[in-house]
Amino acid sequence: MNINIVTIGKLKEKYLKQGIEEYTKRLSAYAKIDIIELPDEKAPENLSDQDMKIIKDKEGDRILSKISPDAHVIALAIEGKMKTSEELADTIDKLATYGKSKVTFVIGGSLGLSDTVMKRADEKLSFSKMTFPHQLMRLILVEQIYRAFRINRGEPYHK
């Protein structure tokens, strides 16, 4: 399986980079994983609703340009469906079973995802009703993908 994580913004924190590198290394035994970082749009100090829409649309266009037409797209969004680790594992297992070898997870910038990205998403996933920094979300997502593969293989880790 090929898994892409398309995300807005550059990761700066060393501890997050190290955590993500560790989990992507572990994941290499199960799947090919690529993290595609796209630049965030510079925002003016006092954002109007129109400014926010313009920024999200520009970031959304960048995101959509990196998504393969045949990819199953999972957008991370606070209004998405919450799943347990086992349910995420089941989702990944079913995608593999039904021949969906390309899965793309999308993490938006600080303003969220554009309407066009949300429409392109095959499903929307929420990790919590709380808001997390999008940089931290990368680490949480990669760990959960790793956990899902371990669960699907019946390997110890997830308890």
Swiss-Prot record:
One Pfam entry name: SPOUT_MTase
EC id: 2.1.1.177
Keyword tags: Cytoplasm, Methyltransferase, rRNA processing, S-adenosyl-L-methionine, Transferase
GO CC, any one term: cytoplasm
Major site of localization recorded for this protein: cytoplasm
Protein location: Cytoplasm
Coiled coil segments of this chain: none
HAMAP family: 23SrRNA_methyltr_H
Subunit structure: Homodimer.
Family statement drawn from the similarity comment of this UniProt entry: Belongs to the RNA methyltransferase RlmH family.
Name this polypeptide is given: Ribosomal RNA large subunit methyltransferase H
Organism encoding this protein: Bacillus subtilis (strain 168)
